[in-house]
From Swiss-Prot:
Assembly with partners or alone: Heterodimer of LeuC and LeuD.
PROSITE patterns, per the entry: ACONITASE_1
Species name: Bacillus licheniformis (strain ATCC 14580 / DSM 13 / JCM 2505 / CCUG 7422 / NBRC 12200 / NCIMB 9375 / NCTC 10341 / NRRL NRS-1264 / Gibson 46)
GO molecular function, one term: metal ion binding
Cofactor entry: [4Fe-4S] cluster
Catalytic activity: (2R,3S)-3-isopropylmalate = (2S)-2-isopropylmalate
Annotated protein name in UniProt: 3-isopropylmalate dehydratase large subunit
Function: Catalyzes the isomerization between 2-isopropylmalate and 3-isopropylmalate, via the formation of 2-isopropylmaleate.
Cofactor details (free text): Binds 1 [4Fe-4S] cluster per subunit.
EC number of this enzyme: 4.2.1.33
GO biological process: L-leucine biosynthetic process
UniProt xrefs under SUPFAM superfamilies: Aconitase iron-sulfur domain (SSF53732)
Highest taxon in the source lineage: Bacteria
Primary gene name: leuC
Family: Belongs to the aconitase/IPM isomerase family. LeuC type 1 subfamily.
Length: 472
């Protein structure tokens, strides 16, 4: 057999029927659902008098539009109906549900891994674009639309076009203060928001190997912002150790057998990718987005580019729109940009590694006057663990609001929004116009950078913190 990439191996293992020039029919191992993109799919099943094909392969939670304060008091009528519909649909069709009273509840892309539902080699889908997060485990995971949600519920399969393969290799040692979020933002900043279109990315190299699972999830999460269908990292001992104790993961002998199989989930020597990109990790800085897409991003110690930096006419127009929407002038220093809000959370950066990183920055400090800062754990499990470690006390004493789990301020579908014209340092994944509220101005950063912005009321190079602590 010809040498294959891990992407090709997982794909080939799940093809039920080859399309012969058309999409292949894939078997889906795990289907994650939430309250926003599933109601119409269940209604479609009822209209066609169909059952859920494999309810044991489906898991549900509510996350997108739930409150993170007084979580049982949902005031928005649409949100209330969606949450009620999910409860009713899961009961009727026999699907496991982590509801608002469950310790398993959380953002769908946080709870899948922490419950051991996400495993190497699986095909995983969800009606949410950031399903690529689960690729951190060596799974082929991608978002689907509502009609596809219905198709998977009723057949446990999906027609999919086989993707091209893209290797992104990053070697070297990251500087102190440079995080997984900075790595993926640097990649998108260099190559743009469309370069991954038609590809599934495999992240390789020393930098990704040295990352924790939480950090790998951050990288794979934002594969979508690079335009890719999905992103993954081959499983290794870090992966196996993480999975070992999880609730739904194989146990005992079954786990050992699974690990032996998972060890084969790696790209063969001599396998050829359709494209390869190589970057030097040691050259990456803490990053801050300045514009209206994640590709408009710069190292924190640089200045906003002027119109002459954009060679294509469309790019010039996009930059002009960004200047106007974000209320920023060309050549302004990133470190001179002041903020009114800080959001630490989302499926990108709401896990224990993220909260510990932010807490380290703010311990003994106070949130700057005029800044509202909130921390939203990605799951109830993360919240419980953070409270065991006393992180909530560090945040609260500094002036942060400590919330219940949910998607929160990542998107303006719930009570947590940024007021029009105000600026937010956010650990989420999208800085589109209106993403955090009408007229809201979003700057994407790492948890450490967000924490520093909360303290200073503006963007500050987090590397200075490490220089100061080293000097002491």
């Amino acid at each position: 057999m010809m040498p294959r990439t891990i992407i090709e191996k997982i794909w080939d293992q799940h093809v039920i029927k080859k399309g012969e020039g058309k999409p292949d029919l894939l078997y889906i191992d795990l289907h994650l659902i939430h309250e926003v993109t599933s109601p119409q799919a269940f209604e479609g099943l009822r209209q066609k008098n169909r059952k859920v094909r494999r309810p044991q392969n489906t898991f549900a939670t509510m996350d997108h539009n739930i409150p993170t304060v007084n979580r049982f008091e949902i005031k928005d009528d649409v949100a209330k109906r969606q949450v009620s519909a999910l409860e009713r649909n899961c009961e009727e069709f026999g699907i496991r549900l982590a509801d608002l009273s469950s310790v398993d509840q959380g953002i769908v892309h946080v709870i899948g891994p922490e419950l051991g539902l996400t495993l190497p080699g699986k095909t995983i889908v969800c009606g949410d674009s950031h399903t690529s997060t689960h690729g951190a485990f060596g799974a082929l995971a991608f978002g689907i639309g509502t009609s596809e949600v219905e198709h998977v519920l009723s057949t446990q399969t999906l027609w999919q076009q086989k993707p091209k393969t893209l290797e992104i290799r990053v070697d070297g040692k990251l500087q102190k203060g440079v995080t997984a979020k900075d790595v993926i933002l640097a990649i998108i900043g260099k190559y743009g928001v469309k370069f991954g279109a038609g590809y599934v990315i495999e992240y390789t190299g020393e930098v990704f190997r040295n990352m924790s699972m939480d950090e790998r999830m951050t990288v794979c999460n934002m594969s979508i912002e690079a335009g890719a269908r999905a992103g993954l990292i081959a499983p290794d001992e870090t992966t196996f150790e993480y999975v070992k104790t999880k609730k739904y993961a194989p146990k005992g002998e079954d786990f050992e057998k699974a690990v032996e199989e998972w060890k084969n989930l790696k790209t063969d020597p001599g396998a050829v990718y359709d494209r390869t990109i190589v970057m030097d990790g040691s050259a990456i800085s803490p990053m801050v987005t300045w514009g209206i897409n994640p590709g408009m991003v710069l190292p924190v110690d640089e200045t906003i580019p002027g119109p002459e930096a954009f060679l294509q006419e469309d790019d010039k127009k996009e930059a002009q729109r960004a200047y106007e929407y974000m209320g920023l002038e060309p050549y302004k220093k990133i470190e001179d940009i002041t903020i009114e809000h800080v959001f630490i959370g989302s499926c990108t950066n709401s896990r224990m590694t993220d909260l510990r990183q932010a807490a380290e920055m703010i311990k003994g400090q106070k949130v700057a006057d005029g800044v509202r800062a909130i921390v939203v754990p990605g799951s109830q499990s993360v919240k419980i663990q953070a409270e065991k470690e006393g992180l909530h006390k560090i945040f609260i004493e500094a002036g942060f609001e400590w919330r219940e789990s949910g998607c929160s301020m990542c998107l303006s579908m719930n009570n947590d929004v940024v007021p029009e014209g105000e600026r937010c340092a956010s650990t989420s994944n999208r800085n589109f116009e209106g993403r955090q509220g009408k007229g809201a101005r979003t700057h994407l950063v790492s948890p450490a950078m967000a924490a520093m912005a909360a303290i200073h009321g503006r963007f500050v190079d987090v590397r200075k913190y490490y220089q100061e602590t080293t000097a002491v």
